Regions:
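Fungal secretory targeting signals
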Residues: 1-19
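Alpha-helical scaffold elements that line and support the substrate/ligand-binding pocket
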Residues: 61, 67-68, 95-119, 141, ...
């Protein structure tokens, strides 16, 4: 008994003040999806058909796994112009608007030797002459933390509204300062700013927040990032994106110029904007693409075709909080953590980027829990565009996630659940694993040389026996290695207010090793795709599945 108690102190320590505190990310291996899982997607299709019947907008939705697009839905509304495509499908071209920002950041990440935490002026020398930007970094720009004004003169009221309209709104009749270049409002027929003019505008615009302080959405920040890409590579920004992202991923219908009209989705109220070159705004919102190409892009991210696993994972991490614990800001991800989609009410990490231009809305999303990517393109939704694209995206998640979660549980139960044993009599060791409504694999029973390991874990954590604790295994994501986390059944109801609802399991992982090996790890042995055994490295157990 003594040897076991020295192996396990705190290695499986109680880690939560709520019911479940699994590590973030997938709690079971993502499910393997068939090519056409109609039983999984039928509810999603019905939900989108209901939206189709209530909107005049045109939209396309695709959902892809790492291997293939397993769901597509296209609806041709009544607000398309008589030019452009007459019926949308996977090869129809939409404007992506600010979804472009993901491509801009990725094009920077793909450059060797770029330090995102150096002052941005190291890569864009003009910033030396812009007050307030001395400490601004590329990472701040990419994460909406630089305090850069949102839009400059492009959407200034004086550029888009007549003097009569401004007067009717009660605004004074004034002209912008003489030193503010009237450029880049291309939708109003103005010429694009030169680089010199752009930085003149920036120098006179001040900042929204102090750099590094708080998130504030900015399109101008990504124009600066586009300039940085050009300076770093010595190549025009649009060519860098083409050479480093579009061509490697086979995105042949994606680019910064309007395609032939027969493929372009053209809303009736946005005919001019459909084909408009946005010049400096290319790096913030200039891309055109198809649903099929977006699925190729999302598969490229899921398969780490451009960035490896470690760098992709780091890229997805939050960079700034919002005032809600359910969403945060990345580079440039808009990260949501809904708690209502999974049966155990734990947060589901959803990494999104939205976009909107007159007549167009777009969404892309990665859901690592299930290894899927989602794209939504909307055209011609009018004043309700924001509501429509969010309703579509939310409907896809709400209807797909329960089925994906159930499939992941079913497949995990078939593969891992069961009894693992070795020895006999007093030397018997065993491990019983199951899949229930909670996260991960539940450890139902665990013995070592006839001793109840779970009783020992409970004793070390001042719990009243094995029934008072819950031990679960979670996948590390490689080589069938899993980590164990122990929690009190029902959570810690007596936690002080500051710690109520928090999760501290990350403090305790791999805390105790025995003779160099972890005591909180279980490795499954797989042969010909079937699990045939389990190994506890720290306890030196080698068990065979019954």
């Amino acid at each position: 008994m003594k040897s076991i108690t020295t192996l396990l102190p705190l290695a499986l320590a109680i880690a939560s003040t709520q019911a479940y505190c699994p590590p973030t990310g997938p709690v079971l291996p993502p499910p393997t999806l068939p090519a056409c899982p109609s039983n999984l997607t039928s509810t999603t299709r019905r939900a989108l058909e209901k939206i189709s019947s209530s909107t005049d907008a045109t939209f396309s939705v695709q959902v892809t796994s790492r291997n293939h697009t397993f769901f597509s839905h296209h609806h041709t509304g009544t607000t398309l112009a008589d030019i452009g495509t007459a019926e949308v499908d996977g090869e129809s071209v939409y404007r992506l608007a600010s979804v472009t920002k993901v491509f801009t950041v990725l094009s920077l990440l793909l450059q060797e030797g770029v330090d995102l935490d150096l002052p941005a002026s190291h890569y864009v020398a003009e910033l030396d002459n812009v007050p307030g930007y001395e400490s601004t970094t590329l990472r701040m720009l990419a994460s909406q933390l630089a305090g850069v004004p949102r839009d400059g003169y492009m959407f200034d009221l004086t550029s888009g509204l007549s003097p009569e309209m401004l007067k009717s709104l009660g605004l004074p009749s004034i002209e912008p300062p003489a030193n503010v270049p009237k450029c880049d409002a291309v939708s109003q027929g103005q010429a694009p700013c030169t680089r010199s003019e752009f930085f003149d505008v920036l120098a006179g615009a001040g900042t929204t927040w102090q750099p590094g302080q708080k998130a504030a959405y900015s399109n101008l920040a990504f124009i600066i990032l586009g300039f940085a890409v050009e300076n770093i590579t010595g190549t025009p920004y649009v060519e860098v994106v083409r050479d480093t992202i579009l061509e490697p991923l086979g995105m042949t219908s994606t680019g910064y110029s309007a395609p032939e009209l027969s493929r372009l989705v053209v809303p009736n109220n946005s005919r001019d904007f459909a084909v408009m070159d946005v010049y400096n705004y290319n790096a913030t919102g200039g891309l055109y693409s198809t649903p099929n190409d977006l699925s190729s892009f999302l598969r490229g991210l899921l398969n780490f075709d451009l960035l490896n696993n470690a760098r992709t994972s780091a890229w997805l991490k939050p960079q700034a909080f919002t005032s809600s614990p359910l969403n945060s800001v990345g580079a440039p991800w808009e990260i949501y953590r809904p708690t209502s989609l999974l049966p155990d009410n734990r947060p589901l990490d959803v990494y999104t980027k939205s976009g909107g231009l007159p007549g167009y809305n777009a969404y892309i999303a990665l859901v690592p829990e299930f290894d899927i990517g989602i794209s939504v393109n909307v055209a011609g939704a009018g004043d309700k565009d924001y509501d429509v694209v969010r309703a579509i995206f939310s409907s896809v998640l709400e209807t797909l996630v329960p089925g994906l979660d159930a499939l992941a549980r079913t497949q995990a139960a078939q593969k891992y659940a069961g009894t693992y044993t070795s020895g006999s009599g007093n030397t018997t060791s065993s491990l019983v694993m199951s899949v229930d409504d909670g996260p991960g694999l539940k450890v139902e029973k665990w013995t070592l040389l006839g001793n109840n390991v779970l009783d020992i874990v409970a004793m070390l954590n001042r719990a009243q026996g094995a029934a008072a604790i819950d031990v679960r295994a979670y996948p590390i994501g490689e080589d069938e290695r899993w980590l164990l986390v122990t929690e009190k059944v029902g959570g810690d109801q007596g936690a002080p207010a500051v710690y109520a609802g928090t999760c501290d399991g990350w403090f305790l992982l791999d805390q105790v090793r025995f003779a160099g090996l972890p005591t909180d790890e279980i490795d499954f042995v797989v042969k010909d795709g079937e699990v045939v055994g389990a190994v506890s490295p720290g306890l030196r157990q080698q068990l065979t599945k019954s």
